[in-house]
Structures are given as structure tokens and as C-alpha cells.
Amino acid sequence: MGASQSTNGPGQKTTSVEELSKRLAYRFANKCFTPLELTHLKDNFFSRALDQGGIRYWNEEILSEFLGIPDGAGSAAYVTSDGSLDAGPVIFRMVSYLGAFPFQNTMAPSVLTFEAMVKVIVLLTERYGKVLKRGRKDRVKLLFGSLADVGRRDIVVQLQEAAEDSLELIGEAGPGSDRTFTHPTGFSVDKPAHDDDGEEDDDDLALAALESLDAIEIFKHDQRIDKTVYESKISINTFRRLLALLMVTAPLRPLGTISKYTTGLSSSILETVNEQVESILAALALDDLEGGIGYKSFSELISTSLPYLFDPLTPLFEHLLFSKNLDVTRKRHSQSQNDPAAKPVPTPPSTPPSSPPLSPVILNGGFDSSILNPTLLSHLSFFLSTTAQIPNIFRNRTRLHPVFSSTEHGESLTSFSHHVMTWQAPSILLIKGVVTSESDEEQITTIGAYLPQPWKQSSSNSSRRSSDVPDQSTLPCLFELSPVHTVLQGSPSLSSLKPNMPVTYFSTKTGIAIGCQIPPPSRKSLGADFLPKPSGGGSLLIDPALEVATLVISDGLNGEGVFLPPGISAHSASKSVSCTTLAASTASISASNHNTTKSISIYSLEVWGIIPSQSLSAQLDSPGSFVEKQDAITQQRAQWDFEAREAERRKVINMKVGVGELEEHSGRALLEMAGIVGDSQYSGLRHLR
């Protein structure tokens, strides 16, 4: 790219950044793809590639059309009127940056050649682990750089310049001499700068790539590896368009039809998508909404409350590894018909195996939800983990079973107990209601909690992990989905909390409490001193009538508790040596990061049971174990049948001491007072530790 090369003597070996970039692409191709996948990728790429001066490449229109992404510039321009899904330019900007890896400062934006496409697919599908042994945490920084568009030169101009100069060498090097490089400025987002925050932020991913090529010195000339501050930012419009695309494609499976999620969207679906997108944007600081999203805010948002946000990009770009033009099975079948004497030879599948039929994530039966919808489920998939092996609820085939609905089953703790206390599996609690502000304006809000343990009384902590950093799927989670995205992760020291700090607490007198401190029982009259008290980073209280919910979000000043303050992850909290250190290190990206109490008038309260996939459950069984796990739905129905039989049996108990109707009613009254029959059989205190 406008750089000259020189040699200092016989046998001197010239090394350029472009050559190293190609070497890394070849290594990625050989190590991260199967021969079959590589064949399909080549067919997809070269059958559509443009040619300019001997360079085969893809432009934005080709990429958007192949991926099925709405793009106002090409034939895939089936974008809606509001343009919310017009994400083609955003995706193309991302791949143009990632294609230059690990020399973004020198080569970005790159022409989307075959080598660049190989690196893009490996990075976005996280297949680089087969070549690079470290650097997973640096992926967030890489994604930020690919999205940053504030403070850069026009992307189109740079792409044109890159295409014209793509055959020129960028640098020169020789053994025993200093390596010097002259190259274009590149993106300002990659310029080295001093880090005033004192935060260690090594480019582990890029460093690992150069280590694999024995080219560390060249990397040091390309960019600093010790500390980097990104001066550029992501514009709100760019991030909004990307969020809308990720929201609608979250359920996408490998080899699934992309257009099913990106086209033909109704106005009501677009409205719910935009509501959830704006909720996530509202979690950013006001300064970010004006001048763009800085790296620090972006990194904190992703790492603490949206760890699986970019998961939909994996199946999206895996589409490049399957070509509809290739059908080896059909060719071999025709050959066998021409040669009947040929022996049948077992052959591998000609195409990547298609995904098994996927059961609906939301199971039918019970009731129609007035809260949960596909868009809300996509929002949940960005941060909710139900298994350690495959965290994403769409990838691990998690199913949600309707357990309780206040709209369907009534606003009664008796009904809640009957449906929820008999559910012996993890669950999700969702509440939709209205908050009245000081100006008497009503605002719809949706909150919830992920509870990995069943709602039952248990004095055993054996189900909790005792590791320093517990698996996220075993920790509870308190969250707000709208109007401001807020996530309060479970404390890694959950098992060491006092017995009066259960995850959930159920009482017919005080209602439902999640993440609260429970006062000791007393015979005195019920008062404020005997109500559950908020603790830790957040708590949720629901009155016995299921009419009012109180959400308390704290900055950590309430001491230890079940939940961490917003903006703190379980991993970072495990490194804190004390509650004081944890509170001092709290730096939330959420607008709710201060002591706030929201009183919510409940419109609807729902509980959804979590059912893991049968194949995943089998993998979690210990080796050699043939014990079948009874389905949670079957268990609940068996419990209901048992209770029905017991109730029927108790009806025939003859408590009459004389004759007449009065004695019969007196006998039944005694049974109800004892809690054997009637609604009172569900009374009492039940809690979960």
C-alpha cells in the first residue's frame, strides 16, 4: 500500500505485513475448517466474487445478498420503512475491519478477499481457539474496533484506496536490522494513546496470532500491545441498527433460513424490537448517547450484562461454509447407477449436517403469555445462561414450560403455591406492570428473575458450586428488561451467606421475597420490622395479593446479599477481597446504578419452567450412570395427582360425633384448621436456600 521494499544483502528475506496476514489466513483455513467446509467456502466465495486487476473480492451488495441482511444499497433492499433493519453497511464495515486482523492499524479497512473472509469467519464464529491458545477476552475490543465509526475517514473512500493499492507491499524487514514500516494511517480507532485509567488492556488475541507466526517484532511496530485507548466511538445509529439485527436473528440456527427473521416483519414486531433496542441503549450513559459509545462503556455493557449479544453472528456467518451448488451425494449416486458392479462405499455427507428439528422454545399449553414474546426471548438470550456447556438458550435447545400466570390462575398465593411449589426445576419469574413517576406519568416496565433452583424448602447447599468462580448458570439473576436494561448477577459467594438470606422466600403473610434478608420469626403483631428487608445489590418483594411489586436496586451500600450491584460480573466480584472493595469498584453502565426503589402495579405475573434438552441432560449424567431423569412436567403432574387423591381420600374421613348436618360441618372445620383439606393446606412458610 504505497510502501517500498529493500534488501540489505544476499539471502536477505523480505517479510511484509500482507504476507504475514496471508500466512495467518492459511493457518486458520487449515486448522479451523474441515476440508469439506473449506471446499464449500471456496465455491460460495469465488462463484460470486468480483474481479478487479486480478483481485477477487466481495463488495457490500454481494455480502448482504448472500447473508440475507437488509441493505438499502443492493438487491437485498427489503428493509422496512423505518430502516431499523438496514444493517448491511454495519456488517460490511465490521468484516472490512476484521479482515485486516491482526494488522488493523496498518491494513484496515481491508478488501474482502478470500483470505480476509477466512479470518472474518474464524473470528466471528470463535473458531480461533484451535490456533490461538489465548485471547478470548480481546474479542470484545476487536468487535468494538470493527463497529467504531465516529472519528474515522469515510469508509467508502478507504475501501477504494485499499482496492487500488492492495498488491503493493506494506513493509520491509531483514535479519539483523531494525524493521521499519511505512503505511497508511488506517483507522484512528487503532492509534496508540496513553491510558489515563491505568487499566491493563493487552491485545491478547492479536498477540497470540503473531506469536503463531513468529512475528512479534512486526506486531510491535504495527500497534502497542501494552495499553490502548480507543479514541474513536460507535455512533448510536450504528449500534441501534446492529442491535435490531441481532434481536431478530437471535433464534437463527446453523443453515437456517435468514430471511425468515429479517423480512416480512409486521409493524407490531418492529415496535417490540425497537422497544427492546431502546432499552439496551438506555443502559448507556447520557454522554454516550450524544457523542457516541466509547470503548469503556461498550466493554462494561457487554461483559457485565450482555455477554452473549454477538452469538447470532456465529450461525449467520457459518452459512458461508455450506454451498447449495455442491451435492456430492447426488453425483456419486448417478455414478453408481452407471456402474452397477461398483461396490457401495460408505461416504461422508456431502454437506454439513442440517440442524435437527427444533422444538419451539416456548412450549404450548397451560396459558397464553401476556408478557413473553419472541423479541423478549431474544433479549433474555443475550445475558441468561441455563447451562455451562452451551450458555445461549437458543443454542442449547432450552424449552420454557408455562407454570403459572396470574391472569390465568388468579392473583392468589394459594394458586401460586399450587403451581410453582410443585415445579422441581429451574424457572424464570416475569412481571409486567406500570410505575407511576413523580409527574404522575405511567411507564410500562418489565422485570424478572432467573432462579436456578426449584421453589422448595431445602437445608442443603449441595447443589451449589463451591468454586471461586461459580458457573453462571448455577447463580440466580435479577433483571429489568424495560424501560432500562439492567442485570444484577448472582453473588459468587452465595453459598457462604447467612441462613436468613435465602434466594427466594415464600410466606402467606408477607408474600414473595427474592434476594432479601428475612427477620427472625416472632409472635408479635406483624409490622415493618418483620417484613423482608432488601440486601445486597438488589431485591424484589411482591405483596401477598400479587398486586404490587417493589424492586430495589442498590449501588452496593446495603452490604452483602444474593445479588451483585449492576455493572459487576461474578468473575470480577470473585476477585474482590471484601464487600468494601466490591462496593468501591462498582462502576455500573446502567442508568439505574444508584439506590432506587420502584413500586410496580402488577398487570401480570408469570413463572416459566426451564427444561434442558434431553441430549444435553444425557451429557451431564455421570459416566456409566443409567438413572433416567424424570421430566419436570411429569413430576409436577404426578404431584398434582397425588394431592388430588389425598384430597379425595380425606373427604371420606368421618368426623361426625353425632348425627345431623351441624356435626358434619364441625368436623370439616377441624380438618381445615389443621391444614389437611381446603385452601389452608397450602399455607405456611416455604423458602429456598
Swiss-Prot record:
Residues 370-611 form the TLDc domain. Pfam families: TLD. GO terms for cellular component: cytoplasm. Residues 173-201, 332-359 are annotated as: Disordered. Residues 343-359 have a biased composition (Pro residues). Coiled coil: none annotated. Belongs to the RTC5 family. This is Restriction of telomere capping protein 5. It comes from Paracoccidioides brasiliensis (strain Pb03). The gene is RTC5.
